[in-house]
């Protein structure tokens, strides 16, 4: 199945402790999970690594969340939405299923 969401898409979390939070996709993993900015934070107990000049301690990092637990956020309706594909002028374009409006391309930065 093709991933309909992409990096830097504005999304909303559907389930879990961060339900309802709006954020962006930071990274998409190959196992069907995504890493979101500032969501699903876990604390990792890190040992110091003097060879790499890395201090030890408790580090907060973003853990992956399954992509079925997130949905793209439609700013026109203010709700989560589904995505479809259609061809416009010979190019494949993503669009919101509720409104039919094309999703603007986001530059990677």
From Swiss-Prot:
SUPFAM superfamilies: Translation proteins SH3-like domain (SSF50104). The keyword rRNA-binding applies. The keyword RNA-binding applies. Pfam families: ribosomal_L24 (PF17136). It comes from the Bacteria. GO terms for biological process: translation. InterPro entries: Rib_uL2_dom2, Ribosomal_uL24, Ribosomal_uL24_KOW, Translation_prot_SH3-like_sf. GO terms for molecular function: rRNA binding; structural constituent of ribosome. Keywords: Ribonucleoprotein, Ribosomal protein, RNA-binding, rRNA-binding. CDD domains: KOW_RPL26. GO terms for cellular component: cytosol; ribonucleoprotein complex; ribosome. Belongs to the universal ribosomal protein uL24 family. Part of the 50S ribosomal subunit. HAMAP family: Ribosomal_uL24_B (MF_01326_B). One of two assembly initiator proteins, it binds directly to the 5'-end of the 23S rRNA, where it nucleates assembly of the 50S subunit. This is Large ribosomal subunit protein uL24. It comes from Hamiltonella defensa subsp. Acyrthosiphon pisum (strain 5AT). The gene is rplX.
């Amino acid at each position: 199945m093709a991933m309909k969401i992409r990096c830097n898409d504005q999304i909303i979390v559907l389930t879990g402790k961060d339900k309802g939070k709006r954020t962006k996709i930071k990274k998409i993993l190959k196992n069907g999970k995504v890493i979101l900015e500032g969501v699903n934070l876990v604390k990792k107990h890190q040992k110091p690594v003097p060879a790499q000049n890395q201090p030890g301690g408790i580090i907060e990092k973003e853990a992956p969340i399954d992509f079925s637990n997130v949905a793209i956020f439609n700013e026109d309706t203010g709700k989560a939405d589904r995505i479809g594909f259609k061809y416009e002028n010979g190019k494949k374009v993503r669009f919101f299923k509720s409104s039919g409006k094309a999703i603007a391309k986001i530059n990677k930065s």
